[in-house]
Amino acid sequence: MSGGDGRGHNSGAHNTGGNINGGPTGLGGNGGASDGSGWSSENNPWGGGSGSGVHWGGGSGHGNGGGNSNSGGGSNSSVAAPMAFGFPALAAPGAGTLGISVSGEALSAAIADIFAALKGPFKFSAWGIALYGILPSEIAKDDPNMMSKIVTSLPAETVTNVQVSTLPLDQATVSVTKRVTDVVKDTRQHIAVVAGVPMSVPVVNAKPTRTPGVFHASFPGVPSLTVSTVKGLPVSTTLPRGITEDKGRTAVPAGFTFGGGSHEAVIRFPKESGQKPVYVSVTDVLTPAQVKQRQDEEKRLQQEWNDAHPVEVAERNYEQARAELNQANKDVARNQERQAKAVQVYNSRKSELDAANKTLADAKAEIKQFERFAREPMAAGHRMWQMAGLKAQRAQTDVNNKKAAFDAAAKEKSDADVALSSALERRKQKENKEKDAKAKLDKESKRNKPGKATGKGKPVNNKWLNNAGKDLGSPVPDRIANKLRDKEFKSFDDFRKKFWEEVSKDPELSKQFSRNNNDRMKVGKAPKTRTQDVSGKRTSFELHHEKPISQNGGVYDMDNISVVTPKRHIDIHRGK
């Protein structure tokens, strides 16, 4: 198949990060507090109460929070021990202002390692590492409207290369290299660190209150924020109820809807406060229904992008297969080392057991040698018989110990043999997967390689594209095929451009299109389809290979190419 005019990983995506420029798709956006998706802050009213070191006004709570404190500015805040940078804290609904405590502590080693793993470079747009999973039923079991917020803070210097404190006072945004946002995968909402695409977040100034060390701030999606700068108190790394640590933290594509429930800003403080700028991310906890909605949207956008970018999908699958093969090779090497060590220990324990058995056999032979003196306690040989018996007892104990050690070594050798066999089998599977992925990539990449147009096309009438939205679409007109046949093209994109240019030059075909579409075709762009035929951002007619290139279908064979609408193109590749 072949996509429309979109290029790059983000051509089929949309922006979901309210008021965050360069959101999930890297395209930029300026949505408000509500993005119309049902995932925005309007579904989770601001309120009071308390949580784990983060509070919405007064009250006392559980976890790391608790207590009341009134700021001179008239808002309530908690000056409890703050959560460590990079660790999530809960903020429960309540009286209208969100309170957080921040410190000057450095990143923990675990969070620093996550940042190091996201240095890139990354292919295929944004990548992320999920840190924590969210269990909404544990956070608000009875009333979904009482869902808490999840607040994560980081030193601003860890997410941006810009010296925030030196920016002009009217600077509205700052470019960041990493963000903490929500992602949805495996039917759960997660908190993740995301990197890999140009992004920017608002910069806001913290305003002092009458209480020393307490400031006010606000940013899109977070209308009222009280920030307590805590010094001299230990930070907490205990996860709040309803938040679990994700295991196997590895970098994966972040998807298209990441950040849909998160609101972020960099807060800078007055110079005299001594507090360095802090990055803050506030995430709305989604209900299970909202998570499913996001998951379905993510799948739809991913499938839409996959359909429009077969080469990139093949490359991504090959990269993944190659990474899996590399890991399989490491597993084999590790298990080979384990087996070699197990064999060495097994042979050593066997030698020790053989020696112990020989010692026991010698002791038994000595007993037999002096056995005739067993009933003659006064004879000199009786003492020799007793000594031989004592030797045999000691030898038997040694044999028992050596046998236990040998049995353990034999079990480890057996387990190591099984583990190595399994690792070798897995590697064989990964080798086959990598081979298949490479073959498919090589075939799909043909569309990026030069080629000569072939094929005769078919006669068409004045309703040429009426069938573009059904079956296999409309054929290449024979008149256009005659113009393009035997011509060399640098790539299939080059062919597509020349195809539409020739259509614009044909008097009978061009009059079937509007003036705007003719203007598009004259410069090699595909004409726009009707509204009911579009799919997301795919709004132009597309060229489809009836026999897929991955199955050796001809890239430039015009008898293998048809014109289809975006909607029909997707349905074809879904087998509909």
Curated annotation (Swiss-Prot):
Chain spans, region Disordered: 1-75, 421-478, 506-557
First and last residue of the signal peptide: none
Biased composition (Basic and acidic residues): 424-447, 535-548
Segments of skewed composition (Low complexity): 36-45
Keywords assigned by UniProt, alphabetized: Antibiotic, Antimicrobial, Bacteriocin, Endonuclease, Hydrolase, Metal-binding, Nuclease, Plasmid, Zinc
Domain of life the protein comes from: Bacteria
UniProt-listed InterPro entries: Cloacin_colicin (IPR024575), Colicin/pyocin_DNase_dom_sf (IPR037146), Colicin_R_dom (IPR024566), His-Me_finger_sf (IPR044925), HNH_nuc (IPR003615), Pyosin/cloacin_T_dom (IPR016128), Pyosin/cloacin_T_dom_sf (IPR036302)
Zinc is among the record's keywords: yes
Enzyme class: hydrolase
Protein name: Colicin-E7
Gene (UniProt): colE7
